[in-house]
Amino acid sequence: DGLEFLRKLMPQYPMPVVVISALSEKVFDAMKAGAVDFVAKPAVADRKQLDSFLCNELPVKIKVASTARVSRYKKPVMFDNNYSTSSKSETNLIAIGASTGGTEAIAEVLKNFSTDIPGTVVVQHMPPKFTEMYANRLDSQCRVKVREAKNGDIVAKGEVLIAPGGDEQMSVVKIADNYQVVLKKGERVNGHCPSVDVLFNSVAEAAGSHAIGIILTGMGRDGAKGLLKMKKAGARTIGQDESTCV
């Protein structure tokens, strides 16, 4: 099948691959095998949706994927485990953002999280419905609890909340001693909804120096300005090493 073909193709002839997939967990196996990105398969019966897919979404994905450094896909993401107890006590919130190639990078980071890690919020650019499946997959692989975020969720210690794909932007606000998720319909920012910049900007305002911002692999600029805002607010900021990025 296509997945097995991809597993044999990439080690011998690395090339940019965009997967067109129905709602299935196999898409994440394809990403692990080296695919650069994926798009949700459109409903063939819906001519308007099909035209939009063929004329807009798919060409953009292919254009972006064509610039990917696929020869590096086999390099593992190394997570620095030198996360001291003192750092944990000072950090109340972690925010992670990723785009193209980010599904596996996020998984590698979260697998290193212990159950006492500060509450974590994540934006990974992904189509609607896939985010819940992705969260469930991560939950089965990690020590921390991972699930898709819902409006009003409290960001709790040892828990990771994944922003749902769709038409809602995810931000975080501080209420008393807690950080709360806000999901609100909004315009695309940097071409994305949810947007990493929207999340990072809100974390900078809500948590300031008590937050950590992590930007992982991606092909665009989403998250760059937000991470800078977090840094200026006193947060610790971390970026994935270029050699392991797509």
Task: Cite the ranges covered by each PLM segment.
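Conserved acid/base catalytic micro-environments in cytosolic active-site loops
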Residues: 1-246
